[in-house]
Amino acid sequence: MKTSGLGRFTLGQPLPAQPHAVCVSLPQVADLIGYEEKDPQTLAALPTGYPRFVRHQMIGQMLADICRHQTSSTCGYLFAREQDCEEVIKRYAPQDAQVQQGNAWTLLQVPKASPDNTQISSYFQHTGCGISSRLAEDYLWERGLLESREILAEVGDAQSIVKETISRAHGPDVGPEDLLLASSGANAFHALFQSAVDHAQSRGKTVWIRWGWLYLDTIEAMNLYASTKGQVIEVHQIGNLDLLSSLFEKHGDSIAGVITEFPTNPLLQAGDLEKARGLCDQADALLVVDPTMVSPKNAGITGMADVVVN
């Protein structure tokens, strides 16, 4: 048994000890190094993990079952929405790709030797468009491939309960009808930014500003869409209001929006949102804020942002 300062955890133990947990124990520095260097022995010990980085074992089992009669070696991508699979095919045009439809999933298979896998894997990771482990569990259970499964409490309209809870965290000016739910934070930003870029372009607005340090998925989503339909300008120091103001003076009505975190993760830096709000109002630009680990309840920024994505 390996130990850590937080107690006694084995390598790969889900935290909490539930099949769909997204945190997993790496109790020693050697385990962390093994994970980062993709050591096969370390990775084999991880049944679950943060979905963008670790393929849940149930998703792996589902993929293996779907491809059980297949003779060729491929990389499989299980999309939650057919539209995202179609977007990948349109964007990267992978050679010899195969698509298979299922119940609430779409499988894209690309030959392992294809160089397209690098870009497709990156898109799949940064957009958060894969299926959930619970969908995989449903598939395996219906196929008779699981001896037991997670037991869930029956509720009425679960989505309404979730929206009501989140809206209260935002404060009295936000109601459940103001919320759109996504499968993950990365997927929420991907959906938002893809639509925002198209809308801004129709209005002749092509300049997007990254204000301060942003999460990797946010950066990559901006690069994915804005780089082909506009321009992304970075303001690395979130306290550099002079630079931010000068960009608005230079680009004016061409600015589509400002994307920022409040506070930034992991440095916990906070920009002057009131100043940014004023600049965006002058240019009729969007202000998009991610309250990161602080959450909307504690950040108190909902009234200053056009969109809060979390």
What do these predicted ranges mean?
Residues 1-191, 195-197, 211-234, 241-243:
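Conserved N-terminal alpha-helix of the aminotransferase class I/II PLP-enzyme fold
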